[in-house]
Regions:
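Metal-dependent phosphohydrolase cores
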Residues: 1-145
């Protein structure tokens, strides 16, 4: 679980500050993602660990942190809501598109950030990530479930 305790955390927080302070992004706190973890906390964890990996590999850690923070911005309870009951079977396939659509309404995104959000469910979906940064978030997301 992400906890703030050093300079690397300060840099990470500055990269995603405009995202985490947004009221719509904050709404992810209302939805459970995995077990007792909120969607917000899950995205924050994926963003932090992906950021660390990308930074160590000399990749675009800013795009990684930002894309990962928004990768599950679908804003519904996929287990219990009426909408989710109809879509539960398809949630894994459709939520990346919903998250990208929601993100684009709020923020300017780079091509890498868009790819990270849209393709993070590979290999469940057939949308193959285009960038190494997208693979980092994809695998960190799987590890964080």
């Amino acid at each position: 679980m992400y906890t703030r305790n050093n300079n690397i955390c300060e840099e990470f927080e500055n990269i995603i500050k405009d995202l985490t302070s947004n009221p719509t992004v904050q709404k992810m706190n209302q939805f459970k993602q995995h077990y007792n973890t909120s969607c917000y906390d899950h995205c924050l964890n994926v963003a932090f660990y992906s950021y660390i990996i990308a930074k160590k590999l000399g990749l675009n850690y800013k795009a990684v942190a930002r894309g990962a923070m928004l990768h599950d911005l679908f804003l519904y309870d996929w287990r219990n809501s009426k909408k989710a009951l109809k879509l539960r079977k398809f949630h894994a396939f459709i939520h990346p598109e919903i998250a990208l659509e929601n993100s684009l309404k709020l923020f300017y995104l780079t091509e890498k950030e868009k790819d990270i959000i849209l393709k993070h469910m590979w290999p469940v979906t057939i949308k193959l990530p285009k960038y190494p940064e997208s693979y980092i978030v994809t695998f960190t997301d799987k590890y964080s479930t």
